[in-house]
Amino acid sequence: MGRRAWIRPDVCFVAFASLMGMACLVLTPPFQVADEPNHFFRIVQIAQGGIVGERRGAESGGEIPVALVSMAGHFIDGNMASGEVRWERSRWANVRPYLQQRADLTATRFQDFRAMTRYAPVAYLPQLVGIWFAEALNLPPLWLVYIGRFCALVFFI
């Protein structure tokens, strides 16, 4: 490519979006973005065939594998609803099992993610592809998060 080809806006966008997107994908700790745990739970629910959220009393959500709820809890320190969340680096010391050991995704429990049940499944299509891919390869649970993020980035670009 000549020098002028790199100056085109579409090429600059793809290059910059790829670079910055990968930086955000890798450098942002799991579940530290607003509502990420709840969006993740909604994606998992849809990936398992739960198109419509369940209503149980005042809560709305769905059946989510206990291993994934436990993983999200490992990374959340504080109150997500109020925004009082702190990320402690010491949590990375115990992250290895979530990256290396496969989890039993058959045991489930009801998880409340009420604000996300309103979103249509089509909004989560890029992440769904990532979750299905990771589940098909029987990857450890944290890979579901990162592959879902990667598919959303690719779809955006």
Predicted feature descriptions by range:
Residues 30, 38-42, 48:
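Extreme N-terminal leader/anchor segments
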Residues 9-12, 27, 104, 111-112:
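Alpha-helical hydrophobic/aromatic positions enriched in membrane-embedded helices and signal peptides
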Residues 22-37:
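Helix-to-loop transition at the C-terminal end of transmembrane segments
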Residues 49-147:
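Interfacial juxtamembrane loops and adjacent helix segments
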Residues 143-157:
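Selective detector of the "anchor" transmembrane alpha-helix that sits immediately C-terminal
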Residues 8, 32, 36, 111-119, ...:
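Aromatic-acidic/polar surface patches that form glycan- and anion
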Residues 15-22, 129, 154-157:
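Generic alpha-helical transmembrane segments of integral inner-membrane proteins
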Residues 1-22:
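Start-transfer (signal-anchor) and selected internal transmembrane alpha helices
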